[in-house]
Amino acid sequence: MSRPDGISGDRYNVKETEARWQQAWEAKRCFEAEIAPGKPKYYVLEMFPYPSGRIHMGHVRNYTLGDVVARYKRAKGFNVLHPMGWDAFGLPAENAAIQNNVHPAKWTRENIAAMREQLKSMGLSYDWRREVATCEPEYYRHEQKMFLDFLKAGLVYRKESWVNWDPVENTVLANEQVIDGRGWRSGALVEKRLLSQWFLKITAYAQDLLDSLATLERWPERVRLMQENWIGRSEGARLMFDLDGRSDRLEIFTTRPDTLFGAKFVAIAANHPLAAELAAGNPALAEFVAECNRMGTSEAAIETAEKKGFDTGLRAVHPFDSTWTLPIYVANFVLMDYGSGAIFGCPAHDQRDLDFANKYGLGWTQVVEPASDGQAVLAAIAKGEAYTGDGVAVNSQFLDGLAVDEAKAEAIRRIEEMGRGERTINYRLRDWGVSRQRYWGCPIPVIHCEACGTVPVPAEQLPVVLPEDVSFDKPGNPLDHHPTWKHVDCPCCGKPARRETDTFDTFFESSWYFARYTSPDRTDVAFDRVAADYWMSVDQYIGGIEHAVLHLLYSRFFTRALKDCGYLNVKEPFAGLLTQGMICHETYKSEDGAWLFPTEVVPGADGKLVHAETGAPVTGGRSEKMSKSKKNVVDPAGIIDGYGADTARLFMLSDSPPERDLDWTEAGIDGAWRYVNRLWRMVATAELPPAGAPMPELSPEAAKIRRLLHKTIAQVGEDLERFHFNKAVARIREMTNGLGELPAGDSGAAWVLREGLEATARLIGPMMPHLAEEMWLALGGSGLLAEAAWPEADPALLVEDSVTVAVQVNGKLRATIELPKDVDAALAEQTALAQPQVISAMSGKPARKVVVVPNRIVNVVV
């Protein structure tokens, strides 16, 4: 027996080792994927990053998870596509240009180069040949062509619309980008503005997007529910209210036509055409409308604002009773882009309507009575709460006595019979406004001609490339200020015309990048059809849940549109989805309330936290998501430089399931580092038989550890299939603890130790790939471990040879014992009666009867 030859020295040189194996993988081109029709494919993808210049711990976790999956699937025999790229357009580059006097393109490309090296230092198994950057004309020329094809297909249109305007970023935000009335990036209070915008017709796919959620069985239920709620299908009626003293009508959508007899008012949006008409002759109303327009257009902004209304003096005629009129208010809580921009209010059965009615003294009428408690509505309203539950219609003429669903159906039938409306379906989902008033984005390929109108840029003139000679010394869009770029001849009539100066929302680029990876070298087409048909859909997508109704929904729509325009043959982009949790760290504040970096805090002599330089007391706060604003961040580069990529990867996998938040702790990273070194020492110091030596007779202890080894192989494979990475790590640790307990000087134990260390190297390969390669080399493994197959467990060793048997005294559990499977009943009885707990429970009395149920129970009757 001898020690392995592949390891020298008395400590693990992590920097040299990791760099060496990264070079070896690159030289061997281990991770370059090609179409292989006879091999099962597996496409694993993590959401690509914005190139800010430095990776953060969230990146480390996200990309580690994806890399474990990619390496494991390769070992299982799959043809794995695992690419990486850059979501490279966006406002931060423009902000950097303003602050640092550097061009966005230069800033972005330098950041990409820096982050590429950081990602490579993690040992990630990417096919770097397929790298894309969305800011390059070679990429966005294809999305300009897609836009023109969508335009031909009727999926694009332009209209004036009220938009969410971010006054800090000077651009339009989609509703999904407005959070609690503020811009999702700047945090500025969002305003309403009327602008001419380009829209993608996502609503054309609303029902299919909703129905197909049921097919996404490998998506988290939470994400599917979020998309279902965002699409927001509601069945109801479109009602036509006559306007008292006028010949026109007001259209109202409602999901509760059964409550019409409880109506007390009508409310219209501040940007409703009727509101604009009435405000033209009413200065007070005009001021109220202007106040409403200073709010954001999203539901979040409206829900958080105080509910206000303005009585226009106009009245609407009740559709079931021409003698009954309702006051019409302009209200700040009515959305113009939901339904028809007008509602009727039934205060007794809608909380918002009740609050509004109470504020303006409009009263209420109960029209639904709970079957179980006739006083429930009165009791609720007395507490300021509307009753929104089921029941039967009351005070509703021909609807009285009908259950709510029956009353809805009957109300709609009468409305249709009278010609005052119809049954309809409405969606909360709005068409996607993709126009952005900024420079660093993909130019929209359209020309505006006074003679010809809106003209698509001819395909042969694509791409429309951003000008490089721009300045950022004025607010707003530099393309608007450019002296020459926007001036162009009309491709139809040849007269002077103007380019569209808006650029695409950056979610446009991320809505199709995953398909571009299948053939990024094709310059003539966005996707090679053979490659796209082979690789798509993405088998496993990994990213944050914050993208549930932004990127993920847009990508589902975009893929459908591409399919309908002949680009792809799939309509769902991501077959499986894993949403990882956040990385959290304790927060720290100085005496004056300023946030402190973790590196600025140390334990004092008394164990309490103090400032590292001044010694001043520091207050430790709760663990929160790592963020620059609270300074509770840890630089991955420092961790990788000090501990190595494998240690960082192991920590990311060890302590929490991937979908949960992970608390970063120094103790945790130190523990991971100790385990890395422990594995290295186990191999470096092991006295092992030659590779391939026949198995000698094993002692019971060695046989027990070998059985644990093979169970671990089987269980770790199952854990990785289910993304239970923390469980896999725990099982490997338990198994290597067992290997460490094998007795020295025992040939059978040494043989099991070699088998165990070889299997350990292969099991940790997806998680700690550099250490795994080093162990594999030292143990005499053939070739690169990155190309080796996953270990297989011996089925015979997975069969339990012992069972846990419960021992009862007079039917009460007193002990459990380990017995050989199918043991003789006499031995089972003898072992049970010898247990101290059983002897105590028998209190010196003889056993009158002992019942043995094989492999399950021994029951002693006294």
Curated annotation (Swiss-Prot):
Motif ('HIGH' region) on chain: 49-59
GO CC annotations, alphabetized: cytosol
Pfam families: Anticodon_1 (PF08264), tRNA-synt_1 (PF00133), tRNA-synt_1_2 (PF13603), tRNA-synt_1g (PF09334)
Motif placement: 'KMSKS' region: 625-629
Binding of ATP, residues: K628
Keyword Cytoplasm: yes
Reaction equation(s) it catalyzes: tRNA(Leu) + L-leucine + ATP = L-leucyl-tRNA(Leu) + AMP + diphosphate
Record CDD domains: Anticodon_Ia_Leu_BEm, LeuRS_core
Keywords: Aminoacyl-tRNA synthetase, ATP-binding, Cytoplasm, Ligase, Nucleotide-binding, Protein biosynthesis
Gene3D superfamilies, per the entry: 2.20.28.290, 3.10.20.590, HUPs, Isoleucyl-tRNA Synthetase, Domain 1
EC top class, as a word: ligase
Compartments, record wording: Cytoplasm
Main location: cytoplasm
EC number: 6.1.1.4
Biological-process GO terms, alphabetical: leucyl-tRNA aminoacylation
Gene Ontology MF terms: aminoacyl-tRNA deacylase activity; ATP binding; leucine-tRNA ligase activity
Keyword Aminoacyl-tRNA synthetase: yes
PANTHER family attached to this UniProt entry: LEUCINE--TRNA LIGASE, MITOCHONDRIAL (PTHR43740:SF2), LEUCYL-TRNA SYNTHETASE (PTHR43740)
Protein family membership: Belongs to the class-I aminoacyl-tRNA synthetase family.
Name this protein carries in UniProt: Leucine--tRNA ligase
